Amino acid sequence: MGILDSLKKPVNIKSSLPKFSRSATSINLSSHPVSSRSFLELPPELFSITKPIFKLLQAHANKIYFQSSDAEAVWNVKDSSGHVFEAESISLLGSHIIITNSSVQVADVAIIDSPSNINQCEISSVGEFLQFNNGQLSITCNDFGLLEKFKRLCMISIFEFISIYKALTGTVISSYGLRMSDMHIILNSPFNFKDWCEVYLDGQGWVKVWCHIDKVSKTNNSKSSSDNDAKGKYQIRFYRDDKSTSSKNCVFFIPDNEYVQDIFFYNINAAEPSKNMNDFFQGLQMIKLVGNVRFCSDTDFNDVVDSGSIYSSANNGSGDSSSTALNNESPNTTPKSRTFFSPKGHRRNSSHVSSLTSRSTKKPITNFTTRTNGLLIRPLPHHGVHHLEAMIRFIIPLMDCARLYGRPVQFKTERTDINSLMFGLPKLPSVDYFAEEEIAHLMTQEFNPLKEKDTDDTMALTMSRFSSYLQERMTKVSKRNTELNFRTFSDVMGMYNTTRDHSKLNCMSDKDNSVKEFSLSDKSNVSSETTNMMNQLQVNAHEYKSSMCERPIVASTSPIA
């Protein structure tokens, strides 16, 4: 009974935020120092179970998906300034397009997010050009069939990259979640969550907002059958501050019936993963939502900035600063250098998993604009709680509301299940999601446009198209892992230099140190280990739910160990 009584008491955690200045030219993605992000050391078992996935990320960064030859075709490249030149060679190395011209200069452009190009993953056809990231780079070829092949290989690279991160997300949730004393409460508390976070907005940078998942009014939902009406029973809403959950205070939202393809942990520097796993996990600070987001039509983003926080530049070097310091900005500070802050300096009480019984009801928002390029979220750390724990507490309610990966009922864990975070995960030493024979077929595969009516986003279309194809292949060819040809870890890491020297891709006669570092002596099956741990988490949650069925929890906040 003492334990149950303790669950009713809210736990207040005082938090202070580091001080930031606003800059239009530089963005520091490690704005929170390691000391404030990581109060506790990472458990050794986390490194052990995630090592195979870490190897897959290393292999992906070194895969050559495409490499042109002089006799193949003529390639012309247009940079962001509009300058057009003929390329000597074009390669797709991991998620980077490497271009050389006759003067041996190199262009290196990431086709997914990078520190200099946040929340950008766009491939489109503009006239005769294949355009990347809204004109950052455009490529054309006199062989249009070859250009289409290049486009599809770019999409395969994106698919594999995101799929590895989805598997990493499932592995971190299952392994680290077992250490969280109240994980059963998190799993049994769908549609009840509120906490501060930062979101990245184009043209604004990182903005601090109040995230709230709750119920919307049923009576208002039934008034209209219009497609433009927000009809979701539950919604993820992001507010300017935590003072009001009215529609006027809402900036953007995601109903539970809106299209969301995927949600997973993310590292903006992931295109060039660190060789040090501890550094990698310290950089794993974001949540990527691939899908549609509804922006309130009357939102003034300048107003959001003034009432929230912009974290778009370097840390001032002082580490954590008190909320009082945040409030001591000079009133004469110019907009360019001013540090914005939320009301009351953002002094939080805790991350909130609200009770199962005390819910509020919001009115639906009917005046909005839908954007399809998803959302990049950075949960804010709590003192005494590792940032990975804060990430887990944040991402599961998002998955619940989006109805992804079996949630809010039970995580799907099988690698053959298209709705699982572990779907299609290669078994080392193989590092490919698709066999060579399947990739050849994908170059001419027709995709059903009727299945793609919900989005025009490159990342969402990529995950939808290639997940469906992979599911079809796994169903038809049960022994594809042994009957078809897949590249292995040594094929990728042993043939190509793991460092990019910005001149050209060099073959290697000997394996470098990274190959020795990631030896395959520990051929662990991360998929089965993660499945076992995820199942144990869910057993614990079900047992707890059964034991509490006659006495529901009544608490305003979740207990945090």
Curated annotation (Swiss-Prot):
Keyword Phosphoprotein: yes
Signal peptide: none
Subcellular location: Cytoplasm
Modified residues (Phosphoserine): 514
Annotated segments matching region Disordered: 314-366
GO-annotated cellular components: cytoplasm
Compositionally biased spans, kind Low complexity: 314-323
Keywords: Cytoplasm, Phosphoprotein
Comp. bias intervals (Polar residues): 324-340
Pfam family, one: PH_26
Note: Present with 3360 molecules/cell in log phase SD medium.
Record's protein name: Uncharacterized protein YJL016W
Organism: Saccharomyces cerevisiae (strain ATCC 204508 / S288c)
